[in-house]
Curated annotation (Swiss-Prot):
Obligatory cofactor(s): Ca(2+); Na(+)
Active site residues of this protein: D260 (nucleophile), E290 (proton donor)
Binding locations of Ca(2+) 3: G329, Y331, H435, D436, D459
Protein name: Alpha-amylase
UniProt KW keywords: Calcium, Carbohydrate metabolism, Glycosidase, Hydrolase, Metal-binding, Secreted, Signal
Effect upon mutating A298 to H/K/L/Q/R: Loss of activity
Length: 512
């Protein structure tokens, strides 16, 4: 009898442990779906408050299933208002008085470190933006012998050699030699686009230099993009940028990187750089590269040249979304996955709808129209393949051209984030069998309570589709988490249901 009582007491203790110590919801489960957020848009105010905004938002992000954020370039640019892509001093994270300011557009180094600490406390990873193609805002000019090249064919020289004054000397008067004593001179670069002595904008290649050849072959050779182009054939440069990468990761306790403008940077160096930082930090350092080309073959070539050691943004999928949103219902929705990275290399695809370059007024403007954005987010957030990214500008709205600003769509994206966090698990079944209405289902996973879903999107008229969600879900009543449809769906004994969607809309059905 005493033994039975002791056994009962132990079982009771174990039961309480299970109740209070195990995760209370799917959100805390070990297999929580990963969701990345790009936490900025191009026209963020130059108020120095962005790192504080990020810190204050950390609880909200965690609640809605965001597991990682990509922060904007954290280092000093050409001015305080620089978005960060005119990189001046990679070691100044808002700490030194340079370019007329201590803080960057986003705030100070200390504020950023506090924000990252807050994110980490909520199990949100932080990916730093890496801008290492060029340097802008040099401290002084240098006399350099150079030739002009044809902008349409960078391999074709169109002038004789002559002297120019190039902005290529970086000595960082505010920082000095803190963190690094490396000073940049003309011979650390391949070329530039400005001759200060003649006030001429041309593409100049420096004497004795050659464009890096492991780059995109657009314009003959697309090594040169802007400012002073970094020469990765120079061993001192390669060593310094590797050293900086390790410092950057350790100084901010980063968990990964977003690599900017990789089609202009020597591919083998990027491969080696990622491997080097991973080795030195002892961390996985998830890395995604921005290779901007609507061409699966070009992206596959990059993945191959970098030994598939990091991911790429699925640019072709973005352009499919853009096309679908602009063709007035004439787009064939069955083709959404055609020639996309996620269809060929799902483990290397970061899927997205829009970003700071595609938003209105920007260099790669190809904005997905507002009505289609919820459909696109349902597509990337509730399917099994790809690592989806949510854009700050879609959640909170964008600024810039007041006639073309993106409105805040948080109220429409939140239910889709909830669907990803709590329901988008298990085997997937696709129904890409109609020009307008396409759908997919997830059967759910026994380790995530009440999981499973059925999603429909259409760029044309509304309608219905009979879809299979698994016999294990028979008898359940499902409802549309987006609120777009009000009628419930009862799953039949064979695991099938008939799901409806409104015209030009999305519906995601989950267990009530």
């Amino acid at each position: 009898m005493k033994q039975q009582k002791r056994l009962y007491a132990r079982l009771l203790t174990l039961l309480f442990a299970l109740i209070f110590l195990l995760p209370h919801s799917a959100a805390a489960a070990a297999n929580l779906n990963g969701t990345l957020m790009q936490y900025f848009e191009w026209y963020m105010p130059n108020d120095g408050q962005h790192w504080k905004r990020l810190q204050n938002d950390s609880a909200y992000l965690a609640e809605h299933g965001i597991t990682a954020v990509w922060i904007p370039p954290a280092y000093k640019g050409t001015s305080q208002a620089d978005v960060g892509y005119g990189a001046y001093d990679l070691y100044d994270l808002g700490e030194f008085h340079q370019k007329g300011t201590v803080r960057t557009k986003y705030g100070t180094k200390g504020e950023l470190q506090s924000a990252i600490k807050s994110l980490h406390s909520r199990d949100i990873n932080v990916y730093g933006d890496v801008v290492i193609n060029h340097k802008g805002g040099a401290d002084a000019t240098e006399d350099v012998t150079a030739v002009e090249v044809d902008p349409a064919d960078r391999n074709r020289v169109i002038s004789g050699e002559h002297r120019i004054k190039a902005w290529t000397h970086f000595h960082f008067p505010g920082r000095g030699s803190t963190y690094s004593d490396f000073k940049w001179h003309w011979y650390h670069f391949d070329g530039t686009d400005w001759d200060e002595s003649r006030k001429l904008n041309r593409i100049y290649k420096f004497q004795g230099k050659a464009w890096d050849w492991e780059v995109s072959n657009e314009n003959g050779n697309y090594d040169y993009l802007m400012y002073a182009d970094i020469d990765y054939d120079h061993p001192d440069v390669a060593a310094e940028i590797k050293r900086w990468g390790t410092w950057y990761a350790n100084e901010l306790q980063l968990d990964g990187f977003r690599l900017d403008a990789v089609k202009h940077i020597k591919f083998s160096f990027l491969r080696d750089w990622v491997n080097h930082v991973r080795e030195k930090t002892g961390k996985e350092m998830f890395t995604v590269a921005e290779y901007w080309q609507n061409d699966l073959g070009a992206l596959e070539n990059y993945l191959n040249k970098t030994n598939f050691n990091h991911s790429v943004f699925d640019v072709p999928l973005h352009y499919q979304f853009h096309a679908a949103s602009t063709q007035g219902g004439g787009y064939d929705m069955r083709k959404l996955l055609n020639s996309t990275v996620v269809s060929k290399h799902p483990l290397k695809a970061v899927t997205f709808v829009d970003n700071h370059d595609t938003q209105p007024g920007q260099s790669l403007e190809s904005t997905v129209q507002t009505w289609f954005k919820p459909l696109a987010y349902a597509f990337i957030l509730t399917r099994e393949s790809g690592y989806p990214q949510v854009f700050y500008g879609d959640m909170y709205g964008t600024k810039g051209d007041s006639q073309r600003e993106i409105p805040a769509l948080k109220h429409k994206i939140e239910p889709i984030l909830k669907a990803r966090k709590q329901y988008a698990y298990g085997a997937q079944h696709d129904y890409f069998d109609h020009h307008d209405i396409v759908g997919w289902t997830r059967e759910g996973d026994s380790s995530v309570a009440n999981s499973g879903l059925a999603a429909l999107i259409t760029d044309g008229p509304g309608g219905a589709k009979r879809m299979y969600v698994g016999r294990q879900n028979a008898g359940e009543t499902w409802h549309d988490i987006t609120g777009n449809r009000s009628e419930p769906v009862v799953i039949n004994s064979e695991g099938w249901g008939e799901f409806h969607v409104n015209g030009g809309s999305v519906s995601i059905y989950v267990q009530r």
